[in-house]
Amino acid sequence: MQVLGIDIGGTGIKAAPVDTTKGTLRTERVKVETPRPAKPDAVAAVVAQHVKNFEWTGPVGITFPGVVVNGVTMTAANLDSAWVGTDTRALFDKVTGASTALVNDADAAGLAEMKFGAGAGQQGTVLMLTFGTGIGSALFRDGILVPNTEFGHIEIRGRDAEKRASERAKELHDLSWGKWAGRVEEYLGHMEALTAPDLIIIGGGISRKADKFLPLLTSLRATVVPAAMQNDAGIVGAALYASLNAPAG
């Protein structure tokens, strides 16, 4: 099945057509900067631009950096508060003229990894964590997604974990790999206590530098591996989600 995948992030909105049977992009992905402020109408205009540029008339899968319930966005920590309570799927259907499916961004990345990447064929409990502007999470039990976990907002030392251990926190506080890895390990220790994962997959752009920090994570019981899909995970996962939730007929 061919689906247009669109990945909405705090800094950029990326899109590409996806072959959902192979988990591959059919063309080079196109990125447009996320509008400032990132209000619904402004972001929707970029989504519509992607659909128009690809001359797309089929199904569209779209990620969102927040909790999504039945197409309605309930949180939007790294965008704009105007999103809260918005029927975002209806908005995107309207501006694109397409049938859209909306999914949490980390859940989308997790779906891609579980189907085509580091989690393929893995049973038991798998925890996918994406480190970027914040920390996204996706939890799977025997391959089944438990949606909208938002574990990046677990409190560590009086602050959201993503304020201490995200990639943005590393850059903002100019942390060495060792210092940052210590914060990540503390966070992962909390996640082990809460979810007892068999496998932890580390995603986000920083997963490309896994050799800099994964060897420093020495106190964890679970196996910790870098994501295989890397920056394509959101786009592929969005498209995969849309294909799995396409209307019958």
Regions found by a protein language model. Give the residues of each.
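Extracytoplasmic strand-loop-helix segments at the start of, or within, the mature domains
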Residues: 135
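A charged helix-plus-loop insertion that forms the helical arch/lid used to bind
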Residues: 73-85
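Conserved NAD(P)H cofactor-binding loop of Rossmann-fold oxidoreductase domains
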Residues: 65
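General beta-strand structural signal in soluble alpha/beta enzymes
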Residues: 100-105
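ATP-binding/phosphotransfer module of carbohydrate and carboxylate kinases, centering on a glycine-rich
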Residues: 1-60, 68-72, 92-98, 112-128, ...
